[in-house]
Amino acid sequence: MNKKEQLYEGKAKKVFATDNPDLVIQEFKDDATAFNNKKKGTIADKGVVNNAISCKLFTLLEQHGIRTHLVEKLSEREMLCRHLDIIKAEVVVRNIAAGSLVRRYGFAEGTVLECPIVELYLKDDDLDDPLMIEAHAVALGVGTFEELAHLKQQAEVINTVLRSFFAERKLKLVDFKLEFGRHNGEILLGDEISPDTCRFWDLATNEKLDKDRFRFDLGSVEEAYSEVERRVLEL
């Protein structure tokens, strides 16, 4: 599969065309950003780690009936993916109170939620990715009510699978972000699943093992990412 012109560059990844218009190559970068690009830096080998974790988790989800954009892992930093028309919604699933949920509603950080909360955010950096209800999303042309219900249903299934997987590896899946896209009339899970897009806490100590270590200058960022990779791939 030949890597051709760059189609897109985001905060953490580049996307390249291939010989097949239905397939793209997603390349993971070491760049790190937080607070909608207001804080920038690099995390050594983050791209390698996130690609490995994402490929493993997409494969796991496929085994549980969740269709994803992953075709195969190509190299340390690259995966071959189905070319998606990305839906302009970020789907966030929350199991434990942290981050913006604490700031908005006054939860104590670490509060275990009665049931998982599934939220929709408009994917728009200029607007700081605002929280939206389904009616907003439909009015903005993000998707239909039926499509949004499907996204939430998929997110709930993904949460069930991933919580169990990470619990076996002594990690709490605090919350995580998902992105979906359309491919030949089907909605597929896209983007990545990694310490960039999830909050992971150690089950015994609640040590943060994700991008919060970069966001809040907690140190040992590379070590945290590598520890998640070790637990995902080796256990």
Curated annotation (Swiss-Prot):
Enzyme Commission number:
6.3.2.6
Q: Which Pfam families match?
A: SAICAR_synt (PF01259)
Species whose genome carries this gene: Chlorobium chlorochromatii (strain CaD3)
Q: Name one GO molecular function term.
A: ATP binding
InterPro entries with a match to the protein in the record: SAICAR_synt/ADE2_N (IPR028923), SAICAR_synt_PurC (IPR033934), SAICAR_synth (IPR001636), SAICAR_synthetase (IPR050089), SAICAR_synthetase_CS (IPR018236)
User: Mind telling me what this protein is named?
Assistant: Phosphoribosylaminoimidazole-succinocarboxamide synthase
Pathway annotation: Purine metabolism; IMP biosynthesis via de novo pathway; 5-amino-1-(5-phospho-D-ribosyl)imidazole-4-carboxamide from 5-amino-1-(5-phospho-D-ribosyl)imidazole-4-carboxylate: step 1/2
Traced from the root, the source organism's taxonomic lineage reads: Bacteria, Pseudomonadati, Chlorobiota, Chlorobiia, Chlorobiales
What PROSITE patterns does this protein map onto?
SAICAR_SYNTHETASE_2
Which domain of life does this protein belong to?
Answer: Bacteria
